[in-house]
Amino acid sequence: MYQTDKKYLLQKVERQDIPLDSPDTTLYVIGNGFDMAHGVPSSYDRFRDSISKRNPLRFTLENFIKKDDIWGNFEDSLAYLDREKMMDSLDEVLDVMGVLEEDDDEFSAADFFGATENVSTPVYLLTQELPDYFRKWINKLKPSGEGRPLQGFLKPDARYINFNYTEFLETLYGIPMERILYIHGDRRDKKCKLVLGHGHDTEEVFREWHQSNKDREKFQPRRKGRRGRYYNNDNPTYLAYFLKDDSKGNWKSQMRYDAINHTVELIEDYYEESAKKTTEVLVRNQSYFASLSSIKQVVVIGHSLSEVDDPYFREIIKSHGKTPDMEWYISWYSPDDLRRIDRFMKRMGLDKKQVKLFRV
């Protein structure tokens, strides 16, 4: 027994003691820990190492994503593009590219849009280049050996939801493809876009960012200049996100006003683009989840149980209808896993009697 806190005692069992006599009522949920247990170098740290330090994509990830350790929780980190850093580069780009006022005879729309696109290069890299790099990396993954530590434990007649993009359930254990739902995509399907992204409510992320920055001196309506005189704030981030009345903004010019607002559109489009479309995935697989009504036990192997995937687990529970009757067997590796499982149980409303832990 392992005590996670004073309220929870989570029972540990040996893998061979898990009753798997009725595979037709058993659902396996497979996460990245499954691949890693088979020697697949599929951690996000390995993905980072596959990208050259000089690559603009890696520079963008490590400099324009405002997280201390983006690789520790990579998909979650994608929700934290640094708005301020992107907006602060706008004036320099407009100046370097020599963008003229819109009423100037030599004004070039191409120069204007070229400048704003230059500022939004991080957005392009994250929405266009990142999925391509990620897929190429995924396509190269393979087990390091022929070991099959779960031989006999994985039942071919059971149901499987695979959160990985790889087919090792099939190739290593002979699980029929038709028994597996590749919930985030199958790397062998070239027409299928792999699901990658954060699961945050983008409006909530914005509110938190706005709330934590609104009182900073940099984002106040009046600022003190070098000579001690006050002036109306002309900072692009302030004008874009904190100014309450556009008509009172120190935009300096119509061209700059348009450039700031166009850049904001590109940045905010990123947040929607980078979100994991969980609802769409659920709708697309509605009939599959409806077919899980007979499932009585769920075996979770190598899944982080992060909140981004909560909707899928709630759908599993919903399909069963009788939450207290469902048994859960969840693999764990470290004390951090135990804490995550504890939080997951509380979010899902699972009783400690329903959940047992085992090691892979």
Feature map (PLM): residue ranges:
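Extended, H/D-rich, highly charged conserved domains that either
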Residues: 60-265
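Phosphate/oxyanion-binding active-site loops and adjacent basic polyanion-contact surfaces
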Residues: 40, 47, 57, 130, ...
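Alpha-helix-centered segments that form part of catalytic cores
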Residues: 139-140, 146, 265-286
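Short secondary-structure boundary/capping segments
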Residues: 41-51, 175-179, 315-316, 345-346
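SIR2/sirtuin-family catalytic core signature
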Residues: 2-38, 272, 280-360
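Terminal, non-catalytic protein-protein interaction segments that mediate quaternary/complex assembly
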Residues: 11-20, 24-34, 43, 50, ...
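Short N-terminal helix/helix-N-cap motif within the alpha/beta-hydrolase-1
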Residues: 38-39, 170
